[in-house]
Swiss-Prot record:
Belongs to the class-II pyridoxal-phosphate-dependent aminotransferase family. Histidinol-phosphate aminotransferase subfamily. Pfam families: Aminotran_1_2. CDD domains: AAT_like. This is Histidinol-phosphate aminotransferase. The modification N6-(pyridoxal phosphate)lysine is found at K210. Its cofactor is pyridoxal 5'-phosphate. Pathway: Amino-acid biosynthesis; L-histidine biosynthesis; L-histidine from 5-phospho-alpha-D-ribose 1-diphosphate: step 7/9. It catalyses: L-histidinol phosphate + 2-oxoglutarate = 3-(imidazol-4-yl)-2-oxopropyl phosphate + L-glutamate. Homodimer. InterPro entries: Aminotrans_II_pyridoxalP_BS, Aminotransferase_I/II_large, HisP_aminotrans, PyrdxlP-dep_Trfase, PyrdxlP-dep_Trfase_major, PyrdxlP-dep_Trfase_small.
Length: 348
């Protein structure tokens, strides 16, 4: 089905004029800066952070574009991936009228952002195998459905979604399809970023929080068409990515081997932890994982969670979520952390 971004944008967004910051109007790096009402004497800390950062994060985009083989014009940075999720909903969904479609069990912020923006939520559960029911998804789409969110690898289940099924949805849906790839570095696939040119209605989300180990800095990436990126840039806060985060991201992108080594260690620990968990009486079922966590079904997820907390081992109780009855989600830790988890579970 043909996609037209203009047809799904809210009228006020089409006509909106972005805030023009001082760094937008003068892009040079040298000079006497008397334009942004900054403190000319420096900072109250040793690190000099008295000047506003690049509002478009050009250096970081250039570095990431080389790594991903994607033009910088197709990259948007957000304050975590939650920011582009919220911006996409605000750009396309009229409060009290439009809807998004989610596929539970899935990442909770899609629903939270929709609720905050007074946007209806259509839920189409995954199959019992945590797979996409494409026919049910497309049948549930309404005239005013603007976005479908697909998390792959999925949180909290850990599995990759079928590429062919995602493509069917992309081809059939006239709105935006968001493919959330926060955990893609732990999966044996390149994901959907290489397919950007084929699907103008696709937005691919990735993050520096997981494989890159930079969760505290809050940096998420949206890969999309130049037109969608332009809309996101128009409505984002002017300096949404701070200087320290930009500098840290540049350093990380210059040391990709460090990230790769951490991913290797996590995958090795994931495989070992799965094998050891499967031997325990508390474990009724382990689900396949393409992420840095494992979903384990037990007889009583809340009791298992509480027991672990008593021993200062913190997991996530997912037992109240649809299709995840009895489940706890376990992040893959270091070897020592994983051994401690197993020791506690052996005494449950």
């Amino acid at each position: 089905m043909a996609f037209s971004l203009d047809s799904i944008l809210r009228d006020n967004i089409k006509n909106a004029k972005p805030y023009s910051s001082a760094r937008d109007e003068y892009k040079g790096t040298e000079g006497i800066f008397l334009d942004a009402n900054e403190n000319p004497y420096g900072s109250a800390i040793q690190k000099m952070v008295n000047r506003y950062p690049d509002p478009l994060q050009r250096d970081v985009k250039t570095a990431l574009s080389a790594l991903k083989n994607v033009s910088a014009e197709h990259i948007f940075f957000g304050n975590g991936s939650d920011e582009p999720i919220d911006l996409l909903i605000r750009a396309t969904c009229q409060p009290g009228k439009d809807s998004i479609l989610i596929l539970p069990p899935t990442y909770g912020m899609y629903e939270v952002s929709a609720g905050i923006n007074d946007v209806d939520i259509i839920s189409v559960p995954l199959t019992k195998a945590f797979d996409l029911d494409v026919d049910a998804i497309l049948a549930a789409v309404k005239t005013h459905t603007k976005i479908i969110f697909i998390c792959s690898p999925n949180n909290p289940t850990g599995n990759l979604m079928s590429e062919d099924k995602v493509k069917r949805i992309l081809n059939a849906f006239s709105g935006i399809v968001v493919v959330d790839e926060a955990y893609i570095d732990f999966a044996d696939t390149k994901g959907f970023v290489p397919l950007l040119d084929q699907y103008p209605n696709m937005v691919v989300l990735q993050t520096f929080s997981k494989a890159w180990g930079m969760a505290a800095l809050r940096l998420g990436t949206a890969f999309a068409s130049k037109e969608i990126v332009s809309v996101l840039n128009k409505i984002k806060p002017p300096y949404n990515i701070n200087l320290l985060t930009q500098e840290a991201a540049l350093e990380a992108l210059q040391n990709v081997s460090v990230k790769d080594e951490m991913v290797y260690k996590i995958l090795k620990q994931r495989d070992w932890l799965r094998e050891e968990l499967s031997k325990l009486p508390v474990c009724l079922e382990l689900y396949p994982s393409d992420a840095n966590f494992i979903l384990m079904r037990t007889a009583d997820g809340k009791k298992v969670y509480d027991y672990l907390v008593e021993h200062i081992v913190i997991t996530r109780d997912r037992s109240k979520i649809i299709l995840c009855e009895g489940c706890v989600r376990i992040t893959v830790g270091t070897e020592a952390e994983n051994k401690r988890l197993l020791d506690v579970l052996k005494t449950y």
